[in-house]
């Protein structure tokens, strides 16, 4: 018993440092899985150990005989001597910040349709893995105008890699690379500029191999420091729409859609390093609420190839839609055999359109021997001409037609994976069904997903079904109506559980994950990869599954000789991540008249506070729109357990606006985030005594009583806003708070997020700000903010601090030099926990 107690206490003591060193216990865990080909193979990323941040590319294989294996395809340290140095382009750093990517090495990859070739970058250098050959080679890009290499995407046919430099869209012909280029040699003629940023309000420039490439390079070079970008997602798309791509291959590899945007109308913001007064501030464009967005354009590029399949030239067409009314390009989807789909939104996100883009006929390149010539090496150069089809008015490539329109009085949600065509041409879209209070899917305009299954994400669309992540609303879909596989744990399949299900177009559905938790899936052919975790496992799980056919002539369990059988092979992918060394002591409950989903984390059984009669309460919410923290996933409560073992009853309550409970619940905060989200946290506090008494009665185990005279709140981002708000506007309930990166003034946040909830009326922003509340402060408040935060600028905390100073209100401010919206420094992350602990201990005496 003594040894166990010491071990538990050691784990709690070591948690802050261990969490920081392991990137929140993610190092060594497999991630980013994708089933490929017939499903017998699956790609994934994983680093070598629990404190190794450098991720490698791996493949899981299930053989026809059911044997399984994990194969290392690409190790950054083998491919690059300086792989640990983490020298990536600034644009890539920005993309990773948008995606909250903290790893290094190979952090993303692109695979062709057959699952044979994989493209990726390491420290800004381009690489290609040929899976069948078992070879990974570097593609050296030496010419300055062809760099940096950003967002490489391999063509579906595996013959080309397209990437962007931000100024140019660049094609790499892999036939030329494979034949002529070794890893250390410049790719040379294999690399071509296919399009550049526009110049002087001209159309996008496509390379036509007739001398205009030089003009494109010359014009674009003049604007390299300008405001136009090509092939990249603008800030609002990456930060708020979860759209990180800025160009898209057609399934037949004959077209590319690419984005260009002009950020010159956006506000110019500056990120400074106050610790180094000699270092100039970095200027960047930011889509500040109630100001102009980037001007986003889309271009359809028809690609021409020579007889060797190498890029020869192209024809660019502007994609036309009502950009003045629908300025947000929210999603792009392209299904084989069909036109590409766009989802565009208006400024307030109350109206959207699903558009089909006409692509026309693929261009034909014809040999033009009369234009042939001999190059300086004496080699004959074959030349080609491009045949340009004629189209009737309104049918030209780049024209669009409206397939569906949607509207909502508050806002329309973006559901990842929609819109999409089924292979046979039916249109699948998302629907906020207010009458059914369910986020649903439609096929050709008709809802088909069940009432009470809140669709969170679409993972795959076939002619037979849609694979999606859902959350059940028990009030709308009772346990008696659930499939057999969920009957034994029906009470846990609710808003806390992100479940993968298959839903057919007649409304029938079946669960593909049975254990409540946070799950996702990738499928291909007869195989799939399931990734996620529940409450029982400290480590995330990844399982590669494949239906394997028995060989002809097998006999088993009375099955006749020669009959075909299918058996499921499940291959767990190894996880090398660290674990905290303790299991959170979590009790789920519902709080208050609104039945808020809540997690109560009590001191561990071995803690010195386990048998305390009464303990202070620490509210630890996010509490804002679009994100939940009460989830059936153990990792959500590790921080909370550390706090509980410092002597607190820790409570996380998901109030109105958090996802998973239907569109009406989400929209209860519309134009009134501040008051509604605080009210729910106050209600949670006062509902806590009865909830704890009920827990004690049900379990037969005594639990500490909550000391409602000593209630504190901590949080980050929206949780930071809520924490500061708690002590400003509800000091009778909350005795102290630590507010990390709080958006104190919503006019300083971005357009797409903020205007969705607050609209465009300045009075609404003033009502939801907490700057004017500064004179009310009568409780201890700690503000924490990173100077390098390009998401929630430190100006938010500085303005609140200035207002507090002007009002003569004592407070603590921890400005963090070099820290972004992620606390990505080991020492800082560790010490932040300890400093907050000590601050609250003093404040609650």
Mark where each language-model region is.
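C-terminal catalytic histidine-bearing segment of alpha/beta-hydrolase fold enzymes
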Residues: 411, 798, 805-845
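Mobile cap/lid helix-loop segments that gate and shape the active-site cleft of serine hydrolases
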Residues: 680, 735-736, 741-779
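Beta-propeller folds
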Residues: 1-501, 505-510, 516-517, 845
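Non-catalytic accessory segments flanking enzyme active sites
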Residues: 32, 54, 107-108, 119, ...
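Short beta-strand/loop motif that positions the catalytic acidic residue
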Residues: 777, 783-785, 789
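Cap/lid segment of the alpha/beta-hydrolase catalytic domain
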Residues: 571-710, 714-722, 729, 744, ...
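Conserved alpha/beta-hydrolase "acid-adjacent" motif
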Residues: 791-799
